[in-house]
């Protein structure tokens, strides 16, 4: 099982809540994924609506909510969003996202580190979205983050793990959970993330914008279950030369 802070997760699949055509499809997809943690944007939530079916349904389930600070352009805005989320959702878990430019939504490492320090000191369980940069990941560990969430590729691109070399360094060196976030575009991308040693993946666009989000969510669930079983079974090493599986003898000994 995966442990983040004081919480255990059976599923290695975390899912987002954006881009769905309706709340109904979103909820069906979340339940089909069997994810135990979902992330949601503070900016999109109507906390004053007592008829918020989405939040009511999730609060009745055992799924953990991970509010995010998406849209924050600096540390000050991110800290404010985190405090609003804590008050509104009664959780000290926060996915820290700071991306000041809007075309590629790349994380601001400097502001992320500043905000992480403040939030950890204020009692938050901080999971920062960050570059696949081993140096910044080490710094985020040092300030007390509970996991790191390096991007596979830019948000919403579905390009997969375009920086897997650096991801492998992070996986080798970092001793807290590593969740590959952003760019996971297919179940095979998610499988690769687990096979190289990541602890979990966060998927949104690939599920929400597919032709059938419910079936796609289920396919990610099955793929990650298979990936975890394979990893725990001990994947066979790779080789650039052939290794015969049968004895090399004279054919039929004629």
Curated annotation (Swiss-Prot):
Keyword Transferase: yes
Enzyme class name: transferase
Domain of life: Bacteria
EC number(s) reported in the record: 2.8.1.10
Subcellular compartments: Cytoplasm
HAMAP family listed in its UniProt record: ThiG
Annotated protein name in UniProt: Thiazole synthase
Species this chain originates from: Wigglesworthia glossinidia brevipalpis
Gene behind the chain: thiG
């Amino acid at each position: 099982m995966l442990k983040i802070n004081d919480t255990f997760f059976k599923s290695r699949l975390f899912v987002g809540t954006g881009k769905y055509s309706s709340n109904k499809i979103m909820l069906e997809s979340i339940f089909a994924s069997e994810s135990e943690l979902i992330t949601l944007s503070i900016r999109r939530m109507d906390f004053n609506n007592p008829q918020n079916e989405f939040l009511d349904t999730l609060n009745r389930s055992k799924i953990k909510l991970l509010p995010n600070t998406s849209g924050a352009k600096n540390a000050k805005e991110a800290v404010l969003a985190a405090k609003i989320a804590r008050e509104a959702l009664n959780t000290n878990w926060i996915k820290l996202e700071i991306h000041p430019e809007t075309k590629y939504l790349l994380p601001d490492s400097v502001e992320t580190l500043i905000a992480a320090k403040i939030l950890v000191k204020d009692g938050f369980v901080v999971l920062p979205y960050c570059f696949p940069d081993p140096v910044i990941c080490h710094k985020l560990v040092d300030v007390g983050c509970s996991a790191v969430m390096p991007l596979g590729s830019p948000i919403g691109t579905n390009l997969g793990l375009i920086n897997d070399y650096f991801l492998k360094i992070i996986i080798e060196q970092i001793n807290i959970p590593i969740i590959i976030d952003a760019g996971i575009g297919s179940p095979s991308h998610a499988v690769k993330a687990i096979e190289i040693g990541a602890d979990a993946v966060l998927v949104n666009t690939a599920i929400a914008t597919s032709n059938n989000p419910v079936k796609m969510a289920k396919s990610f669930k099955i793929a990650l279950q298979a990936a975890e079983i394979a990893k725990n079974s001990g994947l066979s090493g790779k080789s650039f030369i052939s290794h015969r599986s049968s004895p090399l003898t004279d054919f039929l000994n004629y």
